[in-house]
Amino acid sequence: MPQLDTSTWLTTILSMFLALFIIFQLKISKYDFYHNPELTAKMLKHNTPWETKWTKIYLPLLLPL
Protein backbone atom coordinates (compact mmCIF):
# COMPACT_ATOMS: atom_id res chain seq x y z
CA MET A 1 0.00 0.00 0.00
CA PRO A 2 1.59 3.31 -1.06
CA GLN A 3 2.22 6.04 1.47
CA LEU A 4 0.54 9.42 1.30
CA ASP A 5 2.85 12.16 0.01
CA THR A 6 2.48 15.13 2.37
CA SER A 7 5.45 17.16 1.14
CA THR A 8 3.28 19.73 -0.68
CA TRP A 9 0.68 20.18 2.05
CA LEU A 10 2.48 23.08 3.73
CA THR A 11 2.68 25.01 0.46
CA THR A 12 -0.97 24.29 -0.30
CA ILE A 13 -2.18 25.37 3.14
CA LEU A 14 -0.07 28.53 3.21
CA SER A 15 -1.19 29.55 -0.26
CA MET A 16 -4.82 28.92 0.74
CA PHE A 17 -4.45 31.20 3.79
CA LEU A 18 -2.80 33.87 1.66
CA ALA A 19 -5.57 33.69 -0.94
CA LEU A 20 -8.29 33.87 1.74
CA PHE A 21 -6.57 36.84 3.37
CA ILE A 22 -6.38 38.69 0.04
CA ILE A 23 -10.02 37.88 -0.80
CA PHE A 24 -11.28 39.12 2.57
CA GLN A 25 -9.15 42.25 2.36
CA LEU A 26 -10.64 43.03 -1.04
CA LYS A 27 -14.16 42.44 0.27
CA ILE A 28 -13.63 44.63 3.33
CA SER A 29 -12.00 47.42 1.33
CA LYS A 30 -15.21 47.92 -0.67
CA TYR A 31 -17.10 49.16 2.39
CA ASP A 32 -17.23 52.89 3.07
CA PHE A 33 -16.57 53.71 6.72
CA TYR A 34 -17.08 57.10 8.28
CA HIS A 35 -13.90 58.69 9.55
CA ASN A 36 -15.35 60.39 12.63
CA PRO A 37 -18.79 59.09 13.63
CA GLU A 38 -18.90 61.18 16.83
CA LEU A 39 -19.23 64.41 14.89
CA THR A 40 -22.13 63.30 12.69
CA ALA A 41 -24.26 61.17 15.02
CA LYS A 42 -25.51 63.15 17.99
CA MET A 43 -27.12 61.14 20.73
CA LEU A 44 -30.32 62.55 22.17
CA LYS A 45 -30.69 62.10 25.91
CA HIS A 46 -34.13 60.79 26.83
CA ASN A 47 -35.14 60.96 30.46
CA THR A 48 -36.81 57.74 31.48
CA PRO A 49 -38.58 57.17 34.81
CA TRP A 50 -36.22 54.44 35.94
CA GLU A 51 -33.14 56.63 35.53
CA THR A 52 -34.27 59.01 38.27
CA LYS A 53 -35.45 56.31 40.71
CA TRP A 54 -33.53 53.78 42.72
CA THR A 55 -34.35 50.28 41.53
CA LYS A 56 -33.39 47.00 43.09
CA ILE A 57 -32.58 44.05 40.88
CA TYR A 58 -33.32 40.61 42.26
CA LEU A 59 -31.38 37.71 40.84
CA PRO A 60 -33.30 34.43 40.48
CA LEU A 61 -30.83 32.59 42.73
CA LEU A 62 -31.37 35.06 45.58
CA LEU A 63 -35.11 34.59 45.77
CA PRO A 64 -36.40 32.66 48.81
CA LEU A 65 -37.48 29.08 48.29
UniProtKB/Swiss-Prot annotation:
It comes from the Eukaryota. The modification N6-acetyllysine is found at K53, K56. It is found in: Mitochondrion membrane. Its main location: mitochondrion. It is a single-pass membrane protein. GO terms for molecular function: proton transmembrane transporter activity. One of its GO terms (cellular component) is mitochondrial membrane. Keywords: Acetylation, ATP synthesis, CF(0), Hydrogen ion transport, Ion transport, Membrane, Mitochondrion, Transmembrane, Transmembrane helix, Transport. Disulfide bonds: none annotated. The modification N6-succinyllysine is found at K53. The chain crosses the membrane at residues 8-24. GO terms for biological process: proton motive force-driven ATP synthesis. Component of the ATP synthase complex composed at least of ATP5F1A/subunit alpha, ATP5F1B/subunit beta, ATP5MC1/subunit c (homooctomer), MT-ATP6/subunit a, MT-ATP8/subunit 8, ATP5ME/subunit e, ATP5MF/subunit f, ATP5MG/subunit g, ATP5MK/subunit k, ATP5MJ/subunit j, ATP5F1C/subunit gamma, ATP5F1D/subunit delta, ATP5F1E/subunit epsilon, ATP5PF/subunit F6, ATP5PB/subunit b, ATP5PD/subunit d, ATP5PO/subunit OSCP. Belongs to the ATPase protein 8 family. Subunit 8, of the mitochondrial membrane ATP synthase complex (F(1)F(0) ATP synthase or Complex V) that produces ATP from ADP in the presence of a proton gradient across the membrane which is generated by electron transport complexes of the respiratory chain. ATP synthase complex consist of a soluble F(1) head domain - the catalytic core - and a membrane F(1) domain - the membrane proton channel. These two domains are linked by a central stalk rotating inside the F(1) region and a stationary peripheral stalk. This is ATP synthase F(0) complex subunit 8.
